[in-house]
């Protein structure tokens, strides 16, 4: 007999309560206000939007911090095809730097929330939680363009960690693709993602040997790569969960089976480019999860 009942699994597919959702929305609103009311930043073209599990509506009760992207658009970083120069595409440079921008965002948050409430970290600037808001990770980014030979480009975001590492992401494509898959699976994609995330926390709470490489983001991307039929063709969460684990286990036994898997944005490979996780990590985790569930 399985460890959890169908009712338990069903309850874990649901989003946070209304009161938790209100706290999340308060956090996003206050970050917007901090940026728009800042004397220096208010004169620049900046877009503030949610990203990560909050924006994708895949957060679970134990993971109710949020990521807010604060994107600068008066300049952009870019990657060009080989043998092309920025002059070929009419790109002009700006004297304003990413480092200056992150400092300016930090100052705006300190002015809004107070120095004691704001902590600068390697990848983000964290606003501490209180009774009104949840902990909020503010990620200052710039527009980023990945050019093709013909001059067309894919637009994303780029930022530099305080340790000097550049990271590019495609949060808007991630959100759009997640919505599309959710619509094509009777809203089961996001529910199954929440279920996988919740079970990871349950395993950790139970003292399970869960690798730090198995992140909430990775789990969402793994569910993204599960075929829609697994969410659509089975009638219970017990069976959908079971079949998703079987699929992920079978297709991560050999690297060749999953080497083309992408993130939800489908603009970055899931297992390429020096990721902290490997397909072997995922395969081992699926065994651990299966045994935890007592299937």
Swiss-Prot record:
Keywords: Antiviral defense, Magnesium, Metal-binding, Nucleotide metabolism, Nucleotide-binding, Nucleotidyltransferase, Transferase. A motif (Pyrimidine specificity motif (R/Q)xW in donor pocket) lies at residues 275-277. The record marks 169 as: Important for uracil base recognition in acceptor pocket. The keyword Protein biosynthesis does not apply. GO terms for biological process: defense response to virus; nucleotide metabolic process. UTP acceptor binds at residues 51, 123, 169, 276. Its cofactor is Mg(2+). Its EC number is 2.7.7.-. UTP donor binds at residues 53, 197, 217. It comes from the Bacteria. GO terms for molecular function: metal ion binding; nucleotide binding; nucleotidyltransferase activity. Residues 1-28 are annotated as: Disordered. Mg(2+) binds at residue 67. Residues 7-19 have a biased composition (Polar residues). Binds 2 Mg(2+) ions per subunit; only 1 is seen in the crystal structures. Belongs to the CD-NTase family. E02 subfamily. Monomer. This is Cyclic dipyrimidine nucleotide synthase CdnE.
């Amino acid at each position: 007999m399985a460890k959890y009942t169908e009712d338990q699994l069903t309850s874990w597919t649901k989003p946070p309560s209304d009161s938790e959702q209100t706290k999340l929305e308060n956090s996003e609103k206050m970050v917007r206000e901090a940026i728009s009311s800042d004397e220096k930043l208010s004169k620049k073209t900046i877009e503030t939007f949610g990203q990560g599990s909050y924006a994708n509506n895949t957060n679970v009760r134990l993971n109710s911090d949020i990521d807010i992207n604060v994107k600068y658009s008066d300049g952009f970083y870019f990657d060009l095809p080989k043998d092309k120069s920025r002059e070929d595409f009419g790109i002009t440079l700006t004297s304003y730097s990413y480092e200056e921008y992150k400092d300016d965002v930090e100052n705006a948050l300190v002015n809004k929330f107070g120095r004691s409430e704001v902590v600068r970290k390697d990848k983000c600037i964290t606003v501490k939680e209180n009774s009104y808001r949840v902990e909020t990770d503010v990620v200052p980014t710039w527009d980023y363009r990945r050019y093709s030979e013909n001059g067309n480009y894919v637009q994303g975001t780029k930022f530099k960690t305080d340790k000097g590492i550049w990271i590019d992401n495609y949060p808007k494509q991630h959100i759009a693709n997640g919505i599309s898959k959710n619509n094509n699976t009777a809203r089961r994609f996001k529910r199954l993602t929440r279920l996988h995330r919740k079970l990871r926390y349950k395993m950790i709470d139970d003292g399970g040997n869960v690798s730090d490489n198995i992140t909430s983001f990775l789990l969402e991307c793994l569910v993204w790569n599960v075929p829609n039929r697994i969410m659509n063709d089975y009638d219970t969460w017990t069976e959908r969960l079971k079949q998703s684990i079987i699929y992920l286990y079978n297709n991560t036994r050999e690297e060749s089976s999953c080497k083309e898997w992408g993130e939800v944005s489908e603009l970055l490979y899931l297992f390429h480019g020096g990721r902290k996780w490997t397909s072997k990590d995922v395969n081992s985790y699926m065994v651990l999860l299966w045994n935890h569930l007592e299937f």
